[in-house]
């Protein structure tokens, strides 16, 4: 399986049948392999679900072994918005490849992520033309509320999880 983003893939146990996909997006400085560890417990409860964990499309600016969806070292909100939209475009290309390969529609795909991956999942989940099954986010936020208000197209079900120290 070759996609536009290098990915760690965790297939369902004992089944070739794939009915659902969970796309797990790592946080700033992480990679697909790191976040794929979540799938090891989840897959016991989600038969026929494939977990696809891409690396960000850019090397991380402060961690040369990790990746990023956009650079967080700059504090310019316009720059961050522009870079996050570039990342969204790359992720949309990636998601379309997954949909084609596994013959899935958005309603069979969950977007999930940690920190910066959560931020990307929220934006993708709310600006898509077609509603995703859900977004499950950990320790993230909306990148730019004003921009998202303008671009929001669907009301995807969202579960956001934060610790009491976030």
Enumerate the predicted regions with their spans.
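Active-site signature of alpha/beta-hydrolase-fold catalytic machinery across serine-
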Residues: 37, 123-127
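A conserved short beta-strand
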Residues: 130-142
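Serine-hydrolase catalytic machinery in alpha/beta-hydrolase-like enzymes
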Residues: 4-104
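Alpha/beta-hydrolase fold nucleophile elbow
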Residues: 103-113
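Short, proline-enriched alpha-helix->beta-strand connector loops that line the catalytic pocket
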Residues: 19-20, 107, 153-158
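Gly/Ala-rich beta-loop-alpha elbow adjacent to hydrolase catalytic centers
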Residues: 112-117, 121
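Short beta-strand/loop motif that positions the catalytic acidic residue
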Residues: 159-166
